[in-house]
């Protein structure tokens, strides 16, 4: 049976969702972030040397990195359901979006999150104006433009396509879900992207997504309505 090592409010949620989409038997091993630092606990280092989540074990295989896990599960258990044919042009569209989600879209979003935490961190009162100014300048000069460029790109693609690849829901949509959920929740830019909002709502309405919410517990980036 597959074991998912699940960290709250993380990329782990999309792996749980994928397991539900595939109808696989699995068990969830929960790991909780440190409430002060928001970092993963030491318990995850017993699973993988880097102590990161998500990670899965499937028989003798232990695998980390959500993109690798999505690809492994889809190719091993759901090729026809969630992947385009390997000899079709759509295959490379899948590969592109699989890597784009974490390689291009997620880094500026993560940087924005880090700077938000820096801005909120306790510092001496006389340092606060300087910290706020530095964060604001980095956001204005770099992060906001980077995030906007990526969200413009995704919005344009989704304006012409119901799903990312091959005209149907698939593994690429699951992989892209987390950065889009994070972008809508944290950037304050969601109002500019109606197609992204509709697309994410469409993902979050899937029965397997809702089952994953119940299995995983509270998820900061999920829909506002508690699943039945």
Task: Give residue ranges: language-model regions.
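GST-like domain detector, emphasizing the conserved glutathione-binding G-site
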Residues: 1-134
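Positions that flank functional sites
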Residues: 33-34, 169, 218
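Structured helix-beta-strand junction loops
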Residues: 50, 76, 160-161, 206
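Flexible loop residues that form catalytic
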Residues: 61, 179, 217
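Short, hydrophobic secondary-structure boundary micro-motifs
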Residues: 80-85, 107-109, 162-167, 192, ...
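A short, terminal or domain-edge coil/loop segment
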Residues: 82-91, 114, 137-146, 213-228
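GST-like fold's C-terminal all-alpha helical module
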Residues: 101-205
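Long hydrophobic alpha-helical segments typical of transmembrane helices together
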Residues: 189-228
